[in-house]
């Protein structure tokens, strides 16, 4: 099976995803052109348990652009243009093991609300052409310092008129938010804010039950396999369904899960120290039913950005991935957050 064939049914709700990974499948390449939305969900505690009808949607093929990165790999990027002048730009990054096309309902929802949206890929996932081998590895640092700046620059080029600067916000899922937190600490970061959904630290002490066991014991297994092979393999042994992944990235994640410290290899800055200085507003969300990013996990990641990040819980049972296919609740909170920013009320408490 080659790198472009490892595609699960993108119309289905994923079996699992998480702070430890976000598996629909590592190759999110091809989607049904008219996929129905998943069924009804039951509102979470405190919401009256009312029946909520998801909005019926039909996927519209987006415009696509490509960017060649420093390693020669190519990143395809979805372009969703609103009618009229954009309110702002949103650059979206997926979770670990998830292709960008899974998120089309969220992209279209934001577009319909007047936002210009670019949806990128994480390195080596979805339509991104990098292939992890023993001799070709990347990690958190490479993605934060290469992939994220490339996507932001592409979005500004696509959506801005010459001499114009529109507000630009990152929207990141799970692993995408971990990496986004590093990007904000970099000197070239060029965004006005970041909202994350289901992003937290994978430190096993932030979890209970099956997830505690999976992270406590599964992390060392993934570290060992990725060290021996030089990459994390796809196929029958990929029980987590992350798809083929860079060995360096998996090892960095596994140590993060083990000791709560993220220390990217070959980094050109001290990310932990620089994150303490970030003041770009960050809103970190988790949804009811998300066992793979607990509130404690998200708050732990938010604490790494003490001058920038605040955490909130969405009391609707949208889990770790379902919010992306039923995007109204997150889109509503995003719009409200932008209103709060405009009046200076969205900063973390002092």
Protein language model annotation of sequence segments:
Residues 314-350:
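Catalytic active-site module of serine/aspartate enzymes centered on a nucleophile-bearing elbow/loop
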Residues 294-303:
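Short alpha-helix in the alpha/beta-hydrolase fold that links the catalytic acid
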Residues 171-261:
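Alpha/beta-hydrolase-fold enzymes
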Residues 137-158:
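Alpha/beta-hydrolase active-site loop
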Residues 95-98:
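Active-site glycine-rich loops that stabilize anionic/oxyanionic intermediates
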Residues 109-131:
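Conserved alpha/beta-hydrolase
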Residues 49-79:
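N-terminal cap/lid segment of alpha/beta-hydrolase-fold proteins
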Residues 278, 284-286:
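Short beta-strand/loop motif that positions the catalytic acidic residue
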């Amino acid at each position: 099976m080659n790198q472009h064939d490892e595609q699960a049914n993108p119309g289905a709700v994923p079996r699992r995803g998480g702070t430890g990974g976000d598996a629909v499948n590592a190759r999110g390449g091809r989607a049904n052109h008219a996929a129905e939305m998943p069924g009804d969900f039951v509102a979470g505690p405190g919401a009256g348990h009312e029946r909520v009808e998801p909005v019926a949607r039909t996927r519209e093929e987006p415009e696509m652009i490509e960017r060649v990165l420093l390693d020669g790999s190519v990143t395809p990027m979805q372009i969703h243009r609103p009618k009229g002048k954009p309110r702002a730009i949103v650059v979206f990054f997926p979770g670990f093991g998830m292709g960008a096309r899974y998120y089309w309902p969220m992209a279209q929802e934001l577009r319909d609300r007047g936002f210009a949206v670019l949806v990128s890929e994480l390195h080596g996932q979805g339509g991104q052409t990098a292939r992890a081998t023993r001799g070709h590895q990347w990690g958190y640092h490479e993605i934060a310092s290469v992939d994220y700046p490339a996507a932001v620059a592409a979005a500004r080029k696509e959506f801005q008129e010459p001499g114009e600067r529109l507000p630009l916000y990152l929207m990141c899922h799970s692993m995408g938010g971990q990496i986004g937190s590093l990007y904000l600490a970099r000197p070239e970061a060029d965004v006005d804010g970041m909202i994350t959904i289901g992003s937290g630290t994978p430190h096993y002490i932030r979890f209970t039950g099956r997830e505690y066991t999976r992270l406590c014991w599964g992390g060392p297994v993934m570290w060992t396999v990725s060290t021996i092979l030089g990459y994390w393999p796809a196929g029958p042994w990929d029980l987590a369904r992350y798809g083929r992944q860079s060995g360096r990235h998996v090892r960095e994640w596994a140590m993060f899960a083990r000791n709560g410290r993220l220390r990217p290899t070959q980094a050109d800055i001290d990310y932990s120290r620089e994150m303490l200085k970030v003041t770009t507003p960050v809103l970190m969300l988790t949804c009811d039913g998300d066992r793979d990013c607990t509130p404690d996990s998200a708050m732990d990641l938010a604490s790494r950005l003490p001058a920038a990040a605040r955490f909130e819980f969405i009391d609707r049972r949208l889990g770790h991935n379902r919010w992306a296919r039923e995007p109204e609740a997150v889109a509503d909170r995003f719009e409200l957050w932008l209103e709060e920013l405009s009046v200076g009320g969205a900063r973390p408490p002092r």
